[in-house]
Amino acid sequence: YNSENGTVTRLVPAGRNEGEGMYFISMNLNGDIVSAFDFGTKKFVEINLNEYATPGYQPTFTSLTDNNKTPIGAIRIGDRLLSTGVYTQGRYCISQVSGDDTYSVSYPACTDPTLTDTLKSAFYASNTLAVKPTLERLACANMQTGCLDICEINGNELTRVNEVHLTPAKVKFNRHRPKGRGLVHPVNYSKYHIFGFCDLAVSDDYIYALYSGRTLKQHNLDVDKGKTILVFDWNGSHVRTYRLENACSSISYSAEENTIYALSQENNHSEIITLHL
């Protein structure tokens, strides 16, 4: 978005063809590189902000579907990609440039300990990911359940440091595939289910988590927004809470300014809320 003339330019053309994208989630900014996972094409896209306006510039796309993977989110860790998805070998997969995949860490504790790993992966499918600037730890916040998972990064494997659950889930699991070819919903959320995290931002010392705390009954399709920022240290201890005036969908942190910027979109009006720490 150009604030001077009000024009909007697509960084990635819409579509399923080469060099195009469909549905982007979990956008991250690392230096001059903006990255996001394309849920539609299962590719990880990276855009150089210093070059994107150059005629003929093309973002970098990396497919994550090799080795029969079904990814749902991803983030870069140095020269490797870390993804979550419908994985039964472990909650996290680190993919190396060589093409080798390493899975690690069990799924968080569920309300029903008898669930299969496939149902657990569906239950914890929608996540927002963030990596500590030193690349030593990962924060994974679940959008549906309010579960914050913090892991230490050891080479190509992860070790869980802490697991924070804010509220119990109000869900039903479909353990058997129905007859016919109808759409299958393995996890059904109650209208009273309290939704979890909308977005993450991190610093060397803290994890800033934008929290929804909303239900489908009260907010319908606006459950992916929140007015609360919960601050945790990298061991998972709650440090403080900030309240925002407007419901926001995403946040970012500026280390240079020690400031959080939150994006609010209410009543067809977009606004950047500034929170000086």
Task: Cite the ranges covered by each PLM segment.
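Blade-loop segments of beta-propeller domains
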Residues: 4-35, 39-40, 60-65, 117-118, ...
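Asp-box/WD-like beta-propeller blade repeats and closely related beta-sheet repeat scaffolds
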Residues: 39-84, 110
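Short coil/turn segments that connect the beta-strands within blades of beta-propeller domains
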Residues: 30-32, 78-80, 134-136, 204-207, ...
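Loop/turn-rich, solvent-exposed surfaces of beta-rich toroidal or solenoidal domains
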Residues: 189-231
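Repeated scaffold domains used in trafficking and secretory/extracellular systems
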Residues: 19-28, 65-78, 124-128, 195-199, ...
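Beta-propeller blade signature
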Residues: 92-99, 222-237, 274-277
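Conserved blade-ending motifs and adjacent loop-strand segments that build the rim/top face
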Residues: 12, 19-21, 65, 165-182, ...
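Flexible internal linker/loop segments at domain or repeat junctions
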Residues: 157-199
